[in-house]
Amino acid sequence: MAERQATIASSSGLHARPAKLFVQAVQEKGVPVTIAVDGGSDLNAGSILSLMGLGASHGTVVTLKAEGDGAEQALDELVALLETDLDAD
């Protein structure tokens, strides 16, 4: 199982717009991905409701996990997305 940590860069955390963009990216990867905050349960990263319930604000460190073909590359790309301010236009 591949695992990566990322720091949420979006200025408002994983609220509606960044969460939507992240969920779309997860679903495009074709591998199951989970996300968790320190000490929390692994949640489905492909679910907007799970992401919104995570309560990840700017600067929160999250752990992503994935399994299967392409998991390493998928996580690298997802970490890069989370570490980009998705609120900046």
Where are these regions (language model features)?
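C-terminal structural segments of small proteins and small subunits
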Residues: G53-D89
